């Protein structure tokens, strides 16, 4: 059987050597269950896809408030203050491109069937992070066209909202001690002091 599985959005582009680079990294790091490469927009701008485990406020600010109002919150949530040229152990890696160790998937479980698109990546990354390292690896890169269907389509927005509600119902809305502990540890490791 396969050692690794790749789950990716249809709007992802990458060079053939990307998969080999990620597999080599995973082969050398048996404690890593999931890895995400550096992600760029087609115009070369970086996508900030390393994130803290979200609070309800993080997702509301990010989705519904004007960018300027949520700037400080977004910088912290998306770890924009950190060096995106360095490897990091991140609890929430974007679902746009998930490179997963099959053995780890068997241990933590597959995608939770309650989530159909949106929220499933947060849930799986979190479960994986509890038992394995979940690494951002800038030694490989991809291009994500970022179609952002839930920003353009009312039906997709409603699915997004429903699944985020399901995520918080599963893990906790405001009183999630595990989230608080994981996020505090990561911010400390990244020397966040604002």
Please place each PLM-identified region on the residue numbering:
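Conserved donor NDP-sugar-binding/catalytic core segment of glycosyltransferases
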Residues: 13-49
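Short, flexible, basic/aromatic active-site loop/helix in glycosyltransferases
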Residues: 54-90
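Glycine-rich, basic loop-to-helix element that forms the pyrophosphate-binding segment
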Residues: 1
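Active-site-adjacent helix/loop segment of glycosyltransferases
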Residues: 126, 130-194
